[in-house]
Structures are given as structure tokens and as C-alpha cells.
């Protein structure tokens, strides 16, 4: 009985781990190719940054109920993405000097790492990621069926 209990716990943890690795890779690879399509090139660090952003956006439902208006999830998601982008930019562009991107020529930028135009550009992507993540979790991992409230 004792061994069976730990076996079940390990299997639950492995399912959780595999699910999150799959979702992380989907978002990281997708963002990497979006950037290649948009800029013509990318950097491997963007795969990690995109994976982290997608993972965090997908887990917003763990902190907010389904009754939370969708626009609030998008607003919080945008702030989260900006924070992750800033930290990633600080590490790869300022500390490591890899010069992956530079927004210093764009208006309303913060140390050339984040800027208002891209904060606005992220909104449709955040919208898509939240919905995609919810449905992937529903279809592939048998989690709760998504339902949204636009306004409350």
C-alpha cells in the first residue's frame, strides 16, 4: 500500500511535468518562428522567453477564476509579458551583451528593452495564447472546458 501511494504520486507529478514541458515547448517554438517570420531571424533565448511567457499566461487561470473578465486576464498577461521581456532583455542584452534586440529607437522605451508599441502588439498574441492554452489543456489533458466572460 505504501509503495502504491508513492507510485501514484510520482505518476501524477510526471503527468504534470510532461504537460508543462509540452506546453512550454509549444509556446517557445511558436514564438521563435513568429519572430523569424516578423524579423527574418531569431535567437535561441527567444525560445526560452516565449516558452516562459506562454507558460505563465497559460497558468493565469490558476490564479484567476473563469469569472474574471477576459480583458483583465489580457491586461495582466500584457504586464506579465512585459516583465518577462524586460528581465530577459536585461540579462541577454545588458548583462551578457548579446544584443538580441534594441527598442531604444522606439517611443516610450525602458532602457531599450521594452516599449509601448510592442506592449500593444503583444495584446492579440496574449489573447490567442490564453485561448489556445485553455483549449490545449481541455483537449489534450482533459482539464476543465474553457468559458470566458468578456465584461463583468
Predicted feature descriptions by range:
Residues 2-152:
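Aromatic-rich, lipid-facing transmembrane alpha helices and their immediate juxtamembrane interface loops
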